[in-house]
Design a protein with these regions (language model features):
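Solvent-exposed beta-strand/loop surfaces, strongest in extracytoplasmic domains of secreted
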Residues: 1-235
Length: 235
């Protein structure tokens, strides 16, 4: 737009395992591998500025208006990660953490972590955005099995603020939770109740899922069968 007229263009990307993720001639352009830490959840992805125009995707040439291989500068500061839509959250400047939510159903084959690398620009350079996609199989099928133990949840009365959530896996890996239905949200290991709609018909059903994704790599663990617990809120 007009407000960026006269500003230089900059290009951002992401590194995985110390190497830039290759630009590809696809809609998302960057396709990092599903490569997690020992916890099976943390993805190390370091945003960076390109120092020359990349030829892997025609968009670099289009965005920069320069031929591939041409040196290119960038603004001060660092680019950052932002989630577009995903069962994941940004957990630090250089990590995403898989965090299952009701966006993914366990009946599908795969789900995508769509994220972007951004820099807001400065007085010399215009903002830069680069999207990327990690493909996540809904279930990891290699490695040893694991099973979740998640005790049933008791019914509650309206007005309860929160209840603790406790579940474990025989793999020793940490179990996560998400709210599948009902006026609730998960915050860490607690289920927090939101304000009830004034016309709510009691009892109101709540459904919570405990999950453990497993891990890839040298000691692979399969995805656990998710355990769903349902309870009621009474007036």
């Amino acid at each position: 737009g007009a407000r960026f007229r006269g500003l230089k263009r900059q290009l951002v990307g992401v590194m995985q395992g110390g190497e830039p993720v290759k630009q590809q001639n696809t809609h998302m352009q960057l396709h990092p591998a599903l490569r997690t830490e020992e916890d099976g959840l943390t993805l190390n992805l370091k945003p960076f500025f390109y120092d020359k125009v990349d030829g892997g995707s025609p968009r670099h040439k289009m965005w920069s208006r320069q031929e591939p291989g041409t040196p290119i500068g960038h603004a001060s500061g660092e680019p950052y990660l932002e989630i577009i839509a995903a069962p994941a959250v940004v957990s630090s400047d250089t990590t995403l953490t898989i965090s299952w939510n009701r966006m993914a159903t366990w009946e599908e084959k795969e789900v995508f972590i769509d994220f972007c690398i951004k820099h807001d620009g400065d007085s010399e350079y215009r903002p830069a955005v680069q999207q990327a996609r990690i493909t996540l199989p809904i279930r990891l099928t290699e490695g040893k099995e694991q099973h979740i133990n998640f005790a049933p949840l008791a019914d509650v009365k309206k007005g309860v603020k929160s209840i603790p959530l406790a579940a474990s896996s025989d793999s020793g890996l940490k179990v996560g939770f998400y709210a599948e239905s009902g006026p609730v949200r998960v915050e860490g290991d607690r289920l927090v109740f939101e304000k009830m709609p004034p016309k709510a018909k009691y009892p109101v059903e709540v459904s919570v899922v405990a999950w453990q994704y497993g891990r890839t790599g040298e000691n692979p663990v399969k995805t656990a069968e998710p355990v769903r617990r349902t309870f009621l809120i009474y007036e």
